[in-house]
């Protein structure tokens, strides 16, 4: 099954509260002609109108905000990191969710941000530096190989974010079309990564799995796979009514979430190691 949404793209910004108060930034941008609308998050706004690219302002360069979809802000919120947590971000670039986690942790605790691509690792480093993040270790490695080092040294995590590579990333590339083979490849890789993630969790640790794909094979089927394969993991119920103003509904597995257009499509599930 291939689902492609090509409607009008909504634009949002996440205010970096490590550097600036949301209302202060809102006034600065509105004074420049940007029209902002509040969301369910007091530090996120929808950009209704802007006389210039929202990614080319002094405020952006100062690290006062991150342009990203409201959908992509949900996984870090669902993971709900504490200030003293030891966290793994398995597929971290370009850093929107990594820097969001750091913001929620108030730059405390420790985040290990892993990215397989050298090029994307540069973007990750750039965003972490721009946003003033101080609690993050960046690792340029293949998670499928890096896990051997972690397991050998008995390094386990309180919480893990797996925002998995998916066919939704291919859709964003205007020069490519998604094929059934792309979906199958992504699904196999996602199953491998989520299995690794559970291996690296401490007992009672939690993992949030997310994609920007609409395909069942990359979402519910991945969760079904890991729940059937392992007896040391359980699904944690997420409630859709916590995210007001978004077209969000329960997924095809009870307790999972799906975000639908006009918001950026997303799937979110939460697991606990038992």
UniProtKB/Swiss-Prot annotation:
InterPro entries: MeTrfase_RsmB-F_NOP2_cat, MeTrfase_RsmB-F_NOP2_dom, Nop2p, RCMT, RsmB/NOL1/NOP2-like_CS, SAM-dependent_MTases_sf. S-adenosyl-L-methionine binds at residues 91-97, 115, 120, 142, 163, 169, 189. Its EC number is 2.1.1.-. GO terms for biological process: tRNA methylation. NCBIfam families: nop2p. Belongs to the class I-like SAM-binding methyltransferase superfamily. RsmB/NOP family. This is tRNA (cytosine(48)-C(5))-methyltransferase. It comes from Methanocaldococcus jannaschii (strain ATCC 43067 / DSM 2661 / JAL-1 / JCM 10045 / NBRC 100440) (Methanococcus jannaschii).
